[in-house]
Amino acid sequence: MELQGAQEDLGISLSSPRRNHETRPGSKAKGRSSICLQASVWMAGGKLRLRASEHLTQGHQQELRDWNLGEDASLLFSKSPFGAGKLIQAPAHVFRQCWVQGNAWISCITKFDSKRSPEVASSPSYLTVPRRSPLPVFLRPSDRCVCGGCYLGKSTRRRACQSLLSDPLGVTFPTQTRP
């Protein structure tokens, strides 16, 4: 599945997702299927390219069909192992580099206002990560984020991760959890 829409001054490419919950033929666990998207964002003229796995719930596929491709689009917040997520389209003028891998279920979106000041897009389903994040940042409905330590089976509260969640220019981005 590939969606294309005109972009003002940027391009986005999402690689093929990695599947954490494979649905084998004959399996009844279709509602538990989930995807992982790895993204690379750069400032360039061009189009938005989104690749989503066919391994999506029917509801998610319907949401993708309902997108208005004439508008700027955001990265995807997919259904996660921690709870139902949502595929979201949101206006944005500038996307910052981020990457989503493993069990990280996040979206990253920032925009610049008329004075070229960074502004976090307001959506409760977004967790903003720095331009160059050394480790994936996890968002849990329990208001915890896990930075890297997830691979060791450890978790840290959001405050411990706050130092990582900042713009290279020193602007701190708040983390927001889903209601």
From Swiss-Prot:
Residue ranges of the region described as Disordered: 1-32
Protein origin, superkingdom: Eukaryota
Pfam family, one: DUF5556
InterPro entries per record: DUF5556
Protein name, as recorded: Putative uncharacterized protein encoded by LINC02694
